[in-house]
Structures are given as structure tokens and as C-alpha cells.
Amino acid sequence: MTDKVQTTLLFLAVGEFSVGILGNAFIGLVNCMDWIKKRKIASIDLILTSLAISRICLLCVILLDCFILVLYPDVYATGKEMRIIDFFWILTNHLSIWFATCLSIYYFFKIANFFHPLFLWMKWRIDRVISWILLGCMVLSVFISLPATENLNADFRFCVKAKRKTNLTWSCRVNKTQHASIKLLLNLATLLPFCVCLMSFFLLILSLRRHIRRMQLSATGCRDPSTEAHVRALKAVISFLLLFIAYYLSFLIATSSYFMPETELAVIFGESIALIYPSSHSFILILGNNKLRHASLKVIWKVMSILKGRKFQQHKQI
């Protein structure tokens, strides 16, 4: 029964992976083609492309971990291979979260309407420094990933199922509590960008409230371009917050799996939930971006035209 559930969850993970790769690759491809065409890239496109690339890598690492856990559990007993996987998981995990936070910050500075001198100064400079902010996020993620990977592998990453002729069911090299504590600290490290994103969300709400009040006083209505921009930004930010909470809880499940009898099943279940975040959020970003939305509609229209043309040819041959 356990093997059937694991296989089902693995197929689910493959489906989520395919959807996520499709959405994120589309974002990266459209922005890169536009970059080549115009020979320059807008700040928002740079953030979205960086976010898409980091999520493609994150999806690959999570799916690879699922396959190893189900098909080759003994690989967890080797330090070198798992050290590489651990490093790239921590790196891509932090990169994707920090890049999404950068997107929320960018929306806040470009759309919100405040008149504080510090806000106006940062609003004016955000396009100039966004590339440096993204580079700083990369350096910070590497700085976190290297020592964290060493600590995880020094204590051994996981309690692996020992497939031996002895009566041993589980072979563990580390104290489970100590290892779970390290994993928990890694998860807590992602709360900082989450709090920054949450702050941007509330400030955007405050800015929208003030803007609507000004529109009502001037009797110009509430559905102007600035209001629409606020609403689109809020949708993107709140979707990230909700999906991140589910993503965070999924890794809490994976961490607590060290104390469960069916450790492998709990980890795969947690990782199948974790795949929802990088997979589905890309489509929310596509719908919220005019260029990406129009490009996706063109692709859908072309695909439908090709399918209709094939059906017409088949009907004509009959």
C-alpha cells in the first residue's frame, strides 16, 4: 500500500514539475526574446527572468530528490552526492524566495503613492539598483548555502532505509532532534524575506486606500490606471504569500518526518506539496503582466489554429 501511495505521489510530482517548467520557461523565453530584440531589458523583466530561472532549478532539485528517495534510497547513505543536492536545494530555495521578495519590493516602489522623502528617493533609484539587489540576493544565498550544507552532511542528511540482509529496519547516523533543528533553522531563515514581502503587501493596501479616497473626493471614479496597477500588484503579492505559506508548511512536514514511522512517504508528500508554489505562481505572474499575458494568448491562438487546421485536413481527406 505504501509503495502505491509513493508511486502516486511521484506521478503527481512529475505533473506539477511539468506544469512549473512550462510556465517558468515561458516567462524566461518571452523576456529573453524581448531582450535580444530591444537590446535592453526592463527591471521588471530582469526580476521575472531571474525568478523563473531560479524556480526551474528548484523544481529540478525537488523532483530529483523525490526520484532518489523512491528509486535509489541507498544514495542517501553517501555523503558526496547528497551534499551536492543539498547545496543546490538550499541555494535555489533561497534564491527563488528572495527574487520573489524583490518583485514585491519593486511593485511597491513603482506603484505605491507616498510622499516621504526617503520613499521618493528610493522610488527614483529602484531601476538603477535592482540589478545590484538581485546580485546581493545571489551572494547572500550562496553564503547561507555553503555552511548549511556542511552542517547537514556532517550530521548526515537523512535516516535512510537500510536494504540489507540483517534485521535492521532503519540505519541512522545522527541524532534526529539535532538534524531536525538544523532543518528548522534553515526554514526560519526564509521568514525574513517573507516578512519584507508582507510589509510591502500592507503598504500597498494603505497606498491603494489613500488613492481610492483621493479619487472619491475628486469625483473621478475608482477604476483608473493607478488603481488597476495597485490591484494587479496586490494579487501577485498575496498569491506569493499564500503559496509560500503552503510551501513552508510542506517543508515542516518533511522536517517532522524524521519522527514518523513512514519517513519516506512523509517526505515525498511534503515535496509534492512544495512543488505547487514554484509551479502555480508562474501562471499568476503571467496573467498579471500585460506582455506575458498577450504573448500567452498569441501562443494559445496559434495552437488552436494549428489544431483546427489539422482537423479540417482530416475531415477533407475523409
UniProtKB/Swiss-Prot annotation:
Membrane association type: Multi-pass membrane protein
Cross-referenced Gene3D superfamilies: Rhodopsin 7-helix transmembrane proteins (1.20.1070.10)
Gene Ontology molecular-function annotations: bitter taste receptor activity; G protein-coupled receptor activity
Xref: InterPro entries: GPCR_Rhodpsn_7TM (IPR017452), TAS2R (IPR007960)
Compartments where located: Membrane
Entry coiled-coil feature ranges: none
Glycan-bearing residues: 167, 175
Disulphides: none
Transmembrane domains' residue ranges: 10-30, 56-76, 95-115, 129-149, 188-208, 236-256, 267-287
Cytoplasmic side: 31-55, 116-128, 209-235, 288-318
Main location: membrane
Top-level division of the source organism's lineage: Eukaryota
A GO term from the CC aspect: plasma membrane
Pfam families recorded: TAS2R
Topological domain spans for side Extracellular: 1-9, 77-94, 150-187, 257-266
Alphabetical keyword list: G-protein coupled receptor, Glycoprotein, Membrane, Receptor, Sensory transduction, Taste, Transducer, Transmembrane, Transmembrane helix
Similarity comment: Belongs to the G-protein coupled receptor T2R family.
Other noteworthy facts: Several bitter taste receptors are expressed in a single taste receptor cell.
Record function comment: Gustducin-coupled receptor implicated in the perception of bitter compounds in the oral cavity and the gastrointestinal tract. Signals through PLCB2 and the calcium-regulated cation channel TRPM5.
Protein name (database record): Taste receptor type 2 member 7
